[in-house]
UniProtKB/Swiss-Prot annotation:
Function: Produces ATP from ADP in the presence of a proton gradient across the membrane. The gamma chain is believed to be important in regulating ATPase activity and the flow of protons through the CF(0) complex.
UniProt name for this protein: ATP synthase gamma chain
Locations listed in the record: Cellular thylakoid membrane
Organism per entry: Cyanothece sp. (strain PCC 7425 / ATCC 29141)
Main location class: membrane
InterPro entries (UniProt xref): ATP_synth_F1_ATPase_gsu (IPR035968), ATP_synth_F1_gsu (IPR000131), ATP_synth_F1_gsu_CS (IPR023632)
One Gene Ontology MF term: proton-transporting ATP synthase activity, rotational mechanism
Subunit record text: F-type ATPases have 2 components, CF(1) - the catalytic core - and CF(0) - the membrane proton channel. CF(1) has five subunits: alpha(3), beta(3), gamma(1), delta(1), epsilon(1). CF(0) has three main subunits: a, b and c.
NCBIfam families: ATPsyn_F1gamma, PRK05621.1-2
A Pfam family it matches: ATP-synt
Length: 315
């Protein structure tokens, strides 16, 4: 009977854990929806900004745009902005992006280029602090749905490093959202900005939907800045001055999008991890229930044999 009680207690414990993992899965799914809604909400501003920049860049195509954020110089030191999460229970999300950042730092070191880290998220901070890596700034406690104010705070630090020539290039290491079950860490140059990179490019918006009782992602192709400004438009200010003023906004927008994709990737990874944990709990409960029933059946059979044996002994 002691064995039966132990199995019964374990079944109850697994059921309680399953309730927690299922709740975490649903919470993550709701937050993925919020992240999706924020991407859609910021899209009009991003479209208009890209359109203006595209038009200005086309207008200045044959001019020497010697602007601080576009100026390239010999690379002696690089700032690596690494975007990770504050918490675990999200599969390999943190491990993968930290691993890619560590690989990139080794690549720079092999090329004889110095580097420093700007870290977002406790997981990256803990990892690189333990290894005594050079760290210029850290950020924790960002919202699960990143805001423009948070992106602006980080962008200001990066601009300060670049414009003061403390670093010659800024690279971003973040997790690009692909699907609910797939994401990949990527490295992207943030500064100096590439004027050719301001041209319009197709983009995607992800939408979390349900089908057959399961979550899935629908991807919608959108086009940014497909139309430039009219060529006969007259500027009160010099187009170069306007471009100089708008480039920091463009940087903020790029950074905000990266934070949003990283957050969506983390939430999707957590949702998948909790879904797998719930499925594993179901299988474990099923196995434990079978073990419990077999043990209970054996105990009942033993009791019957003892009763029959006792009755035979009395004859």
């Amino acid at each position: 009977m002691a064995n039966l009680k132990s199995i019964r207690d374990r079944i109850q414990s697994v059921k309680n854990t399953q309730k927690i993992t299922e709740a975490m899965r649903l919470v993550a799914a709701a937050k993925v929806r919020r992240a999706q809604e924020q991407v859609i909400a910021t899209r009009p501003f991003a479209d208009r900004l890209a359109q203006v920049l595209y038009g200005l860049q086309a207008r200045l195509r044959f001019e020497e745009a010697n602007l601080p954020l576009l100026r390239r110089r010999e690379v002696k030191k690089v700032a690596l902005l690494v975007v990770s999460g504050d918490r675990g229970l999200c599969g390999a999300y943190n491990t993968n992006v930290i691993k890619r950042a560590a690989e990139r730092s080794k690549e720079l070191k092999a090329e004889g280029i110095d580097y420093t880290f700007v870290l977002v998220g406790r997981k990256a901070i803990q990892y690189f602090q333990r290894r005594e890596q050079p760290i210029d700034a850290t950020y924790t406690g960002l919202e699960q749905v990143p805001t423009a104010a948070e992106a602006s705070q980080i962008a200001d630090e990066l601009l300060s490093l670049f414009l003061s020539e403390s670093v010659d290039r800024v690279e971003l290491v973040y997790t690009k959202f692909v699907s609910l079950i797939s994401s990949r860490p990527v490295v992207q140059t943030l500064l100096p900005l590439d004027p050719q990179g301001l041209e319009a490019q197709d983009d995607e918006i992800f939408r979390l939907t349900t089908r057959g009782g399961r979550f899935e992602v629908q991807r919608e192709k959108v086009s940014s800045a497909t139309q430039s400004m009219p060529q006969d438009m007259i500027f009160e200010q010099d187009p170069l001055q306007i471009l100089d003023a708008l480039l920091p906004l463009y940087l903020n927008n790029q950074l905000l999008r990266a934070l949003q994709e990283s957050a969506a990737s983390e939430l999707a990874a957590r949702m998948t991890a909790m879904n797998n944990a719930s499925d594993n709990a179901k299988e474990l409960i099923k196995g434990l229930s079978m073990t419990y029933n077999k043990a209970r059946q054996a105990a009942i059979t033993q009791e019957i044999l003892e009763v029959v044996g006792g009755a035979e002994a009395l004859k």
